[in-house]
């Protein structure tokens, strides 16, 4: 297996020593992307927030600073990521402002209408059934709540060679903005707004239940 294939597989489900390196790198390399992605998103200080695919836990940490009277939950299906994210957020966990747990987007372990905001940063490429998974996200989101998707890649002619290679090697589903909007609309999301940074191939999608 090539080095790029190994890395993309670790992005899907980071594990072991290589996974820890990848997660630590993502905590740093995704900082600017996440800053741009979150700048448009309202986070009230009493919000209940769920970050799906929390990885190393830095995005959870940043949102917990804004929801300082609420709580931010981080979910990842990698047991190792859960452990690393707990370590990164231990002080906030002790203050009951953060909770990290193992879970999958196919069956989010919360009641309906739970969260004010749900985020997915650099993760939906790997979701097994995107339409069903978006429906599950919508189930646990409060009516009027916000679902935010932040991606470093979307289907684009400018980046088609790179993205096609990554999709094939990493078994990634890289959607176009139009495809993403259609699927979200079909499962019942509304007020769908998509912003792009075309020269970087960045995408931010914000929608409501």
Model-derived segments and their meaning:
Residues 2-9, 13-27, 146-206:
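C-terminal alpha-helical "lid/dimerization" subdomain adjacent to the S-adenosyl-L-methionine
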Residues 41-43, 66-67, 141:
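A generic alpha-to-beta junction signature in SAM-dependent methyltransferases
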Residues 46, 141-147:
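Short glycine-dipeptide loop
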Residues 50-107:
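Class I SAM-dependent methyltransferase SAM/SAH-binding core
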Residues 106-117:
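A short acidic, Gly/Pro-enriched loop at the edge of an enzyme's catalytic core
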Residues 117-129:
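A short SAM/SAH-binding and catalytic strip from SAM-dependent methyltransferases
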């Amino acid at each position: 297996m090539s080095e790029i294939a190994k890395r993309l597989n670790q992005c899907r489900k980071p594990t072991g020593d290589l996974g820890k390196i990848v997660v630590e790198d993502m905590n740093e390399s995704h900082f600017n992307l996440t800053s741009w992605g979150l700048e448009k998103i309202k986070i009230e200080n009493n919000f209940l927030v769920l970050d799906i695919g929390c990885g190393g836990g830095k995005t959870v940490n940043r949102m917990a600073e804004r929801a300082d009277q609420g709580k931010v939950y981080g979910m990842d299906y990698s047991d190792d990521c859960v452990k690393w994210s707990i370590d990164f957020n231990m002080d906030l966990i002790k203050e009951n402002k953060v909770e990290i747990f193992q879970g999958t987007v196919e069956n989010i372990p919360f009641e309906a209408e739970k969260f004010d905001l749900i985020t997915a940063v650099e993760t939906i490429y790997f979701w097994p059934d995107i339409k069903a998974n978006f429906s599950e996200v919508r189930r646990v989101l409060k009516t009027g709540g916000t679902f935010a998707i932040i991606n470093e890649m979307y289907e684009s002619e400018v980046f088609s060679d790179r993205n096609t290679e990554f999709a094939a090697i990493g078994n990634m589903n890289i959607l176009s903005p139009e495809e993403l909007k259609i699927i979200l609309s079909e499962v019942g999301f509304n007020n769908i707004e998509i912003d792009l940074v075309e020269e970087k191939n960045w995408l931010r999608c914000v929608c409501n239940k």
